[in-house]
């Protein structure tokens, strides 16, 4: 999926805003996912997924750090996310529909915490980016 110059700018800008707060923002995105889609908790049965848990904070940070890595590799998402894609498809066997659910919650968190930066154009760019990340992650399911 090609990204325009303005897409790249907006993706990079939003990631720079997110990067210092990956634990907090990631935790909120994960908690929103679990609250709005409780069935997603089944993939984390080995963790304490209650509000404020260290496990949710760590998982959220892991997710957002992977997104940060992807944001620096927009032209090579397949290579950048290959190991993560393999893990989700073959080891964790996560329902690929859950990627979309998490992406939606990440967008909600961005809109809440960065309203000045989350313009309609930035929203569209980051949504496009997260869709490309999701598509890359579930590419190994085929």
From Swiss-Prot:
> Signal peptide span per the entry?
none
Query: What molecular functions are annotated in GO for this chain?
Result: haptoglobin binding; heme binding; metal ion binding; organic acid binding; oxygen binding; oxygen carrier activity; peroxidase activity
Q: Which InterPro entries match?
A: Globin (IPR000971), Globin-like_sf (IPR009050), Globin/Proto (IPR012292), Hemoglobin_a-typ (IPR002338), Hemoglobin_oxygen_transport (IPR050056)
Query: What tissue expression does the UniProt record report for this protein?
Result: Red blood cells.
Any one GO BP annotation for this protein = hydrogen peroxide catabolic process
Q: Which family does it belong to?
A: Belongs to the globin family.
**Which protein is depicted?**
Hemoglobin subunit alpha-B
List positions binding heme b: 88
Give the binding site residues for O2: 59
Source organism lineage?
Eukaryota, Metazoa, Chordata, Craniata, Vertebrata
> Subunit notes for this chain?
Heterotetramer of either two alpha-B chains or two alpha-C chains and two beta chains. The two major hemoglobins, B and C, associate upon deoxygenation to form a trimer of tetramers, BC2, that has a much lower affinity for oxygen than either component alone.
Q: Spell out the GO cellular component terms annotated for this protein, sorted alphabetically and separated by semicolons.
A: blood microparticle; haptoglobin-hemoglobin complex; hemoglobin complex
**Key words of the record:** Heme, Iron, Metal-binding, Oxygen transport, Transport
């Amino acid at each position: 999926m090609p990204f325009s110059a303005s897409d790249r700018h907006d993706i990079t800008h939003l990631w720079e805003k997110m990067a210092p707060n990956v634990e907090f923002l990631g935790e909120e995105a994960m908690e929103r996912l679990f609250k709005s889609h409780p069935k997603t908790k089944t993939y984390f049965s080995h963790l304490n997924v209650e509000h404020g848990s260290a496990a949710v904070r760590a998982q959220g940070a892991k997710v957002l750090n992977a997104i940060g890595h992807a944001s620096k590799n927009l032209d090579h998402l397949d290579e950048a996310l290959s190991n993560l894609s393999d893990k989700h498809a073959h080891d964790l066997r996560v329902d690929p529909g859950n990627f979309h659910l998490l992406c939606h919650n990440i967008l909600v968190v961005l809109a809440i915490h960065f309203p000045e930066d989350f313009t309609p154009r930035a929203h569209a760019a980051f949504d496009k980016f997260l869709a490309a990340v999701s598509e890359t992650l579930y590419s190994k399911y085929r």
